[in-house]
Amino acid sequence: MSAEITRPTVADAVALLHVPAPDRLTDRQRAGSACVFSGIPLTTTGAIDLGPRATTNRHGDPVSWYPRAHRGEIPRAALAALHEHAPGCEPCRDEATLDDCPTGSALRRLMREYR
């Protein structure tokens, strides 16, 4: 009996993207009406929800926020996350074993699906 490898969904992969801290963003970026990466104004068709993110407010209380990005910025953000991840990941450093890493596979999938 062989073990089945579970591959991350696109939503799982999007959650791997590194989002700037809310205090470094404009009000429009924090509100989801502008891309968190570039500041591009977002439309319903061009926006990608990046999933809930946890942070703290100025009083230290935990809060969630819901960043969004322009779909054209996803490949660049995925590549940046992959460059941060890959040096410390043995499967990602060897072309023969690239697909053995779920994180690396998910980030490469994002780059393909949103190019």
Predicted feature locations:
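Short, intrinsically disordered terminal segments enriched in charged and Pro/Gly residues
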Residues: M1-Q29, P87-R115
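Short recognition patches in nucleic-acid-associated and regulatory proteins
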Residues: R30-S64
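Disulfide-bonded cysteine-rich modules in secreted/extracellular proteins
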Residues: C35, L79-C89
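Short Cys/His-rich metal-coordination motifs, predominantly Zn2+-binding knuckles/fingers
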Residues: S38-I40, E73, C92, G104
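Short, non-ligating residues that shape and space the ligands of small metal-coordination modules
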Residues: T43-A47, L79, L98, L110
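Zinc-coordinating Cys/His ligand positions in small cysteine/histidine-rich zinc-finger domains
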Residues: S64-E73
